[in-house]
């Protein structure tokens, strides 16, 4: 419902089953065209689901699908530069091409998907895995109104690359296995951090592999010996 002065408000149910109201600025994705994309993408997905699932699509993204500077970007960059054509053919990075960071990855344009395009909406449904430095929420229009797609995103597997060392933060209520935004896999940086994720966030060791951060791969030792 319009709240005037470029804002809207609408009711929704929280994951705890409580009725809440959201007040936010209007978005270009509130337009009817977004609903049409969702309907068309859902129809295509139903018709071609077996074929799309065989592709084993991975979607990589970062905050608001507007950045390419964290673990998601460096994971994607590694895949593009080190995997064979066959291995990387269905790995895609989702970003708004109007974002400044698009310039950093436009050389991989065949593997870039425009945020909130029809292909993006379709591949959100078809992907077998999301790989990201942020939660599933950042893969779609932020705090959108009633959506055919949003509830399905929450059910898709995600490999959480993190964007900060969890051992230094209290994230259980959000990213814990029983939190409001649980992960399927939770990358950790050390045995110490994995122990914390297992003990306090309730993930198994198999679901919280010690991988380090992909962005650490590009760190350079600039120290000098005196």
Enumerate the language-model features and the residues they cover.
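Active-site and donor-binding regions of nucleotide-sugar-utilizing enzymes
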Residues: 48, 57-220
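Basic, ligand-binding patches in group-transfer machinery
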Residues: 1-57
